[in-house]
Amino acid sequence: EGSGGSGSSGNFTTGSNVRMSSVTNTSNTGTGTSGGGNSAAASGARHNAPPVSVTLTESLLNK
């Protein structure tokens, strides 16, 4: 039970971080001036993409 609880907490934390990243990406896109920055952010997002997809789905289900 303890490990299960930890897993849930971890997922929630990841969801918060993902949301922050999304907001940051939106800001960068709106600026449009930081082209290189967007590229770097994109590569970082790709690595986080697989777990993020699951987290986003879980977040929607929780809501």
From Swiss-Prot:
One of its GO terms (biological process) is rhythmic process. Phosphorylated with a circadian rhythmicity, probably by the double-time protein (dbt). Phosphorylation could be implicated in the stability of per monomer and in the formation of heterodimer per-tim. Residues 1-63 are annotated as: Disordered. Residues 9-31 have a biased composition (Low complexity). The keyword Phosphoprotein applies. Residues 54-63 have a biased composition (Polar residues). Keywords: Biological rhythms, Cytoplasm, Nucleus, Phosphoprotein, Repeat. GO terms for cellular component: nucleus; perinuclear region of cytoplasm. It comes from the Eukaryota. Its main location: nucleus. The keyword Magnesium does not apply. It is found in: Nucleus; Cytoplasm, Perinuclear region. Essential for biological clock functions. Determines the period length of circadian and ultradian rhythms; an increase in PER dosage leads to shortened circadian rhythms and a decrease leads to lengthened circadian rhythms. Essential for the circadian rhythmicity of locomotor activity, eclosion behavior, and for the rhythmic component of the male courtship song that originates in the thoracic nervous system. The biological cycle depends on the rhythmic formation and nuclear localization of the TIM-PER complex. Light induces the degradation of TIM, which promotes elimination of PER. Forms a heterodimer with timeless (TIM); the complex then translocates into the nucleus. This is Period circadian protein. The gene is per.
